């Protein structure tokens, strides 16, 4: 059973979003997604200040099995990328909700996300 944290919201494409307040958010891929992908070998992160439109791919996680795009849940601006993943992409596997986060972003339009209960239902 995949770990799902109650303090986050989730997308249909298996990303988690943590509201930091002040219209800033932290984002990563879910435990379910990292388990399906397998051992991470590379993460292509966006640049700070990149502006991304809703539903656009802005990041790629690459595992021994496949490469998978990460899609924007809103119109957003990247304010930080997790540079630790450059040297340790496996943090996405070992700590997807903590040290393995992908980006922090600013947005005024994050909507249509699922709470932990709704996300658990789509996994079953």
From Swiss-Prot:
One Pfam family linked to the record: GCV_H
Modified residues (N6-lipoyllysine): 65
Any one Gene Ontology BP term: glycine decarboxylation via glycine cleavage system
Chain ranges of the Lipoyl-binding domain: 24-106
Cofactor section: (R)-lipoate
GO CC annotations, alphabetized: cytosol; glycine cleavage complex
Superkingdom per UniProt: Bacteria
Subunit (UniProt): The glycine cleavage system is composed of four proteins: P, T, L and H.
Protein name: Glycine cleavage system H protein
Species assigned in the record: Vesicomyosocius okutanii subsp. Calyptogena okutanii (strain HA)
Lineage: Bacteria, Pseudomonadati, Pseudomonadota, Gammaproteobacteria, Candidatus Pseudothioglobaceae
Gene that this sequence comes from: gcvH
């Amino acid at each position: 059973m995949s770990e799902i944290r109650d303090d986050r919201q989730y997308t249909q494409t298996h990303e988690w979003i943590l509201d930091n307040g002040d219209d800033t958010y932290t984002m990563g891929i879910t435990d379910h997604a990292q388990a399906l992908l397998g051992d991470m070998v590379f993460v292509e992160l966006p640049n700070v200040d990149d502006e991304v439109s809703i539903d656009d791919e802005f990041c790629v996680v690459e595992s021994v099995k496949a490469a998978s795009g990460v899609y924007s849940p809103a119109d957003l601006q990247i304010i930080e990328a997790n540079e630790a993943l450059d040297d340790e992409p496996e943090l996405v596997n070992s700590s997807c909700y903590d040290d393995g986060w992908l980006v922090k972003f600013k947005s005024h339009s994050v909507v249509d996300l699922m709470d932990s209960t709704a996300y658990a239902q789509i996994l079953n």
